[in-house]
Amino acid sequence: MEYRNVSRFSRRKFLFAGFVAAAGRPTTYAQQPAPIPETLTQWLAASAKMRELALQRCLNRIQTMEPSIHAWVQVSPQKNATRGRLSGIPYGVKDIIETRGLATEYGSPIYKGRIGTTDAAIIREMRKHGAILLGKTQTTAFAYLTPAPTRNPRDLDRTPGGSSSGSAAAVAAGMVPFAIGEQTRGSVLRPASFCGVTGFKPTYGLLSMEGVLPLSKSLDTLGFFTHTPADMSALWDSLGHSVGSSEDFDLGAPEPIPDVEPTMAAAYKNALSHLRNAGASIRPIDIAGKLAKLAEANLTVMLYEGSRFHKQRYDQYGNRLADLADLVRRGLQISADFYEEALRYIDSCRVQFAEQFKRTPVILTPAALGPAPAGLASTGDPRMNAPWTALGTPAASIPMPVGTALPLGLQLTAERGGEARVLRTAVRLQNMLGSQPI
C-alpha cells in the first residue's frame, strides 16, 4: 500500500501497529515453521537463509515506509563476506559517521552529495563481526539543533527526537534490527524514549570516535538502538563485551523529578511502584539539584568546544550553517575560565556520584521530560540525559509499558565501566515491568 493513498490518521497508526502486529503475531508450526526474525535476538538465533529473508523484508519495509518516515539519507546495502555473530544482519548508521563510498553529508545541505572516503572505526568494527551496513540514517545538521526531516513512526506528526533521528526511527519502524547513533547531550537516549525503543550509550571513551564528526571532544559518545533491552544485551555481547548474569542490589531513584511533564511524572511514579511490588529494592535519593547543574555544565562544555572546532567552518559558511552558526557565536563568548570551571564541577560530581553508586549501583530517572513533542521544529529537551553524558557514565533508556499512549522511556545509569550492570538491569527491569500498561 502506498501511504499517500491512505488518510493521515490511518497512515500514522498503521506504520507502527503493522510492525508490532508482525513482531507479536502468534504462529504455529503449521502456519510458519520458521518465523522470519524481527528483533535482534531472533536474528541471532536464525539460520543464514532466514537472515536473508529478513534482510529482504527490511528492504521492502524501507521501500514502503520511507516516503512517510524519512529515516534514511541513503540506502545502499554493503557486501560483507566476513563470518561473525552478526553475519547477514543489517544496520543503519548516523550520517555524521564516515563511510567509504556512501553519503556522509552531516545532515547539512552544504555537504549535499559528499561521499565518504574512509570508514570510521565503528564501521570497521561492525564489518569485523559480519554486520551488513544498510545505509546512512538522518541526523540533525552537524548533530546539533537544525532538525532532520525524519518523522516518528509512532506518530508521524511528532519528532523522533535528535540528533540521532533516523537511527531511532529506522529501528522503531522495523527497518533494521539495530542502528548506531551518537550522543553529546541526549541524542541517543531521548530519541529512544520518544520512539519506544531501547537506547544505550557506553562509558565515554570506550568506543573509538575515529571518523565521527566531532561536536564536543569531552562529551561525544557513540550509542546504539535496538527494539528491546535483551536485544541490546545481545548486541553488546556480540561485539565482544561480556554482560554476565543478573545480580541483586539497591536501585536509586530521585522522587519527584522537577520539570517533567505530567504524563512522564505519572508513568515514572507508576513504574517505580510496579517495580517495588515486583520485588525491586528502590531507595529514594536526593540528586535532582546536581543533575540540573550537570546539565548546565554539559551545555557550557559543548558550546565552548563545539564553537572552537567549527570556527573555521563558520568563517567559510556563516549563517548557512543554520543553528550551528548560533552555537559558534554563543560558544566563542564563553571564556576559558568559565569552561574550566564547568569541567571542574563535572569532575567533582564524578567523585560524589562514585560514592552514590556504591550505595545504589544503578540509578533510575525518566529518559525525557515527556513524550515526543508535536511537530518537527524541535527534537525535544535533553536535560534528563545530559548529566550522564557529562559524567561519562553508561546509560540506557528502556520503554515503559504505556499501552497505546505515546512512548515514554525509563533511564538507567551506573558507574563508569558499568555497561554490563546497566544492560543486565535493563533486561531485568523490562521483565519485571511486563507488557501490560502500568
Regions found by a protein language model. Give the residues of each.
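Glycine-rich, small-residue loops and helix-cap segments
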Residues: 88, 128, 132, 226, ...
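Conserved hydrophobic/aromatic pocket- or pore-lining residues that grip, position, or stack substrates
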Residues: 58, 94, 126, 275, ...
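Short, well-ordered alpha-helical
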Residues: 18-23, 29-115, 142-144, 261, ...
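Short glycine/serine-rich loop segments
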Residues: 118-236, 394-402, 406-411
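N-terminal secretory signal peptides
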Residues: 1-9, 13
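Acyltransferase
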Residues: 53-55, 264-285, 311-316, 339-360
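Short helix-loop capping/hinge segments that flank enzyme active sites or metal/cofactor-binding pockets
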Residues: 86-106, 300-354, 399-409
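Gly/Ser-rich, acidic/histidine-flanked active-site/gating loops
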Residues: 33-37, 42-44, 97-100, 221, ...
